[in-house]
C-alpha cells in the first residue's frame, strides 16, 4: 500500500529518520511519564554499575519505540544491536546473536510479538539467568549444553502487546505503552527537524502539518520532507502555512489526516448503516490484508473515536459520519 501517511518504515526513510532522531532525553519531545521513569531507572542502574532490567515498549507504529531504545543506549553508554523478530527464523539465529553480545550490551528486537514459540523458549533462560541452553541431538540421546552469556538488556518493541505470550511478557521488568502525540508536541518536533533540514518552519505551518499527521511523529516527519520539496522548488527558505497547505492538499492528505484509503474504509463502514462489518470482509473490500488494516489503518481511527470494534465487527461512529459530512441516524440503544 503506497500511502504518504503509511506508518510502517520505508527502507529509504532509515537514514533520513536517523538524522532527525534525537540522541538523548533532552531532545526527545513527548511521552513525558515514560521519560521521567526511564531517567530514574537509568540513573539507578548506573549508580549500581548494573545493566538495566529488560524493557518492553508497546503502542502503535511510528511513536518512537526505536528512538527510545537508541536513547537508552546513549544514556547508558552501552552498545546497541538491533534486529527484528521476522529475521530470527531459527533458534540458531537467536543463539548467534546472543553469543555475540558483550557485557552491558543492549539487544533491541522490533516486532517481538512475531517470535515463534520455539525462539521464545531459547530466550527465557537468556533473559532470566543469562544462559543459553542448546540441545544437541534428538530423542533419548539428546543432550543440553549450557552456555553462560554476558549480562545484557533486552528491549522489545511491539504494536501488539496482546500477541505476546504471558511467559515472555512477564520476563520484562519494565513495560511502557507509548501514546499518540498532541499536535503541539508534533509541531515542536517538526520545527526542530526543519532546522536540521536547513529550513525554518513557521509555527502555523508546523501545526498544519501536525494535525494531518495522525498524531504520529514518523508520519509528521515524512510529510515535512514532502512539504520541504514544495518549498525548495519555489526557492523558499521558510515553510509557510500556505505552502504547507498546498503541499498536503496535493498529496491527498485532508485536514483530519485521512488519505484515500482511510476514506474508503470509513465509507465502507458508514454505508453499512450501523451494521458491524467483520475484518475479513473489510480486507476483501479494500483489497488489503487483515494485518495492515489492524496495524496501520485502524489504530488512529480507534484512538480518536471514528470507529468502534465489537465482537461482531467494526462500526462507524457518529464522528465518522460527521467527518464524511453524512447524516448520522441514532440506533434504538442511543435514543
UniProtKB/Swiss-Prot annotation:
The record's annotation in SUPFAM superfamilies points to: P-loop containing nucleoside triphosphate hydrolases, Winged helix' DNA-binding domain
Q: Which GO terms describe its cellular component?
A: cytoplasm; Holliday junction resolvase complex
Binding site residues for ATP:
20-21, 62, 65-67, 128-130, 171, 181, 218
**Location of region: Small ATPAse domain (RuvB-S):** 182-252
Cite the EC number.
3.6.4.-
Q: Where is this region: Head domain (RuvB-H)?
A: 255-335
Region (Large ATPase domain (RuvB-L)) residue spans: 1-181
In Gene Ontology terms, what is a biological process of this protein? DNA repair
Q: Where does DNA bind?
A: 309, 314
Q: What is its main location?
A: cytoplasm
Instruction: Please name the InterPro entries in this protein's record.
Output: AAA+_ATPase, AAA_lid_4, DNA_helicase_Holl-junc_RuvB, P-loop_NTPase, RuvB-like_N, RuvB_C, WH-like_DNA-bd_sf, WH_DNA-bd_sf
Record key words, sorted: ATP-binding, Cytoplasm, DNA damage, DNA recombination, DNA repair, DNA-binding, Hydrolase, Nucleotide-binding
Q: Name one GO molecular function term.
A: four-way junction DNA binding
Reactions catalysed, semicolon-separated, are:
ATP + H2O = ADP + phosphate + H(+)
Name the domain of life.
Bacteria
**Binding-site residues for Mg(2+), renumbered to this chain:** 66
Domain characteristics, as noted in the entry: Has 3 domains, the large (RuvB-L) and small ATPase (RuvB-S) domains and the C-terminal head (RuvB-H) domain. The head domain binds DNA, while the ATPase domains jointly bind ATP, ADP or are empty depending on the state of the subunit in the translocation cycle. During a single DNA translocation step the structure of each domain remains the same, but their relative positions change.
Q: Which family does it belong to?
A: Belongs to the RuvB family.
Which function does this protein serve?
The RuvA-RuvB-RuvC complex processes Holliday junction (HJ) DNA during genetic recombination and DNA repair, while the RuvA-RuvB complex plays an important role in the rescue of blocked DNA replication forks via replication fork reversal (RFR). RuvA specifically binds to HJ cruciform DNA, conferring on it an open structure. The RuvB hexamer acts as an ATP-dependent pump, pulling dsDNA into and through the RuvAB complex. RuvB forms 2 homohexamers on either side of HJ DNA bound by 1 or 2 RuvA tetramers; 4 subunits per hexamer contact DNA at a time.
Q: Which PANTHER family match?
A: HOLLIDAY JUNCTION BRANCH MIGRATION COMPLEX SUBUNIT RUVB (PTHR42848:SF1), PTHR42848
Give the quaternary structure.
Homohexamer. Forms an RuvA(8)-RuvB(12)-Holliday junction (HJ) complex. HJ DNA is sandwiched between 2 RuvA tetramers; dsDNA enters through RuvA and exits via RuvB. An RuvB hexamer assembles on each DNA strand where it exits the tetramer. Each RuvB hexamer is contacted by two RuvA subunits (via domain III) on 2 adjacent RuvB subunits; this complex drives branch migration. In the full resolvosome a probable DNA-RuvA(4)-RuvB(12)-RuvC(2) complex forms which resolves the HJ.
**Annotated protein name in UniProt:** Holliday junction branch migration complex subunit RuvB
Q: Which organism is it from?
A: Campylobacter jejuni subsp. jejuni serotype O:6 (strain 81116 / NCTC 11828)
Amino acid at each position: 500500500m503506497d500511502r504518504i501517511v503509511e506508518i510502517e518504515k520505508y527502507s529509504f526513510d532509515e537514514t533520513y529518520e536517523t538524522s532527525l532522531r534525537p540522541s538523548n532525553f533532552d531532545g526527545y519531545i513527548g511521552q513525558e511519564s515514560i521519560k521521567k521513569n526511564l531517567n530514574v531507572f537509568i540513573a539507578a542502574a548506573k549508580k549500581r554499575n548494573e545493566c538495566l532490567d529488560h524493557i518492553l515498549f508497546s503502542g502503535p507504529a511510528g511513536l518512537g519505540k526505536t528512538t527510545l531504545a537508541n536513547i537508552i543506549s546513549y544514556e547508558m553508554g552501552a552498545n546497541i544491536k538491533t534486529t527484528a523478530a521476522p529475521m530470527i527464523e531459527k533458534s540458531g539465529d537467536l543463539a548467534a546473536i546472543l553469543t555475540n553480545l558483550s557485557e552491558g550490551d543492549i539487544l533491541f528486537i522490533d516486532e517481538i510479538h512475531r517470535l515463534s514459540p520455539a525462539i521464545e523458549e531459547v530466550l527465557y533462560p537468556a533473559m532470566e539467568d543469562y544462559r543459553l541452553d542448546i540441545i544437541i541431538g534428538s530423542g533419548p540421546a539428546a543432550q543440553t549444553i549450557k552456555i553462560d552469556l554476558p549480562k545484557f538488556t533486552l528491549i522489545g518493541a511491539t504494536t501488539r502487546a496482546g500477541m505476546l505470550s504471558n511467559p515472555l511478557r512477564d520476563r520484562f521488568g519494565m513495560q511502557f505503552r507509548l501514546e499518540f502525540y498532541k499536535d503541539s508536541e508534533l509541531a515542536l518536533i517538526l520545527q526542530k527537524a526543519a532546522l536540521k533540514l536547513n529550513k525554518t518552519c513557521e509555527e502555523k505551518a508546523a501545526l498544519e502539518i501536525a494535525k494531518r499527521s495522525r498524531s504520529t511523529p514518523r508520519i509528521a516527519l515524512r510529510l515535512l520532507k514532502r512539504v520541504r520539496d514544495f518549498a525548495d522548488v519555489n526557492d523558499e527558505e521558510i515553510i509557510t502555512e500556505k505552502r504547507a497547505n498546498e503541499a498536503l492538499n496535493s498529496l491527498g492528505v485532508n485536514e483530519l489526516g485521512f488519505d484515500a484509503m482511510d476514506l474508503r474504509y470509513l465509507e465502507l463502514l458508514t454505508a453499512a448503516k450501523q451494521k458491524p462489518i467483520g475484518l475479513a470482509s473489510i480486507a476483501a473490500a479494500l483489497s488489503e490484508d487483515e494485518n495492515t488494516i489492524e496495524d496501520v489503518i485502524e489504530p488512529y481511527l480507534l484512538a480518536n473515536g471514528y470507529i468502534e470494534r465489537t465482537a461482531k465487527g467494526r462500526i462507524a461512529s457518529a464522528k465518522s459520519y460527521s467527518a464524511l459530512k453524512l447524516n448520522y441516524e441514532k440506533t434504538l440503544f442511543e435514543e
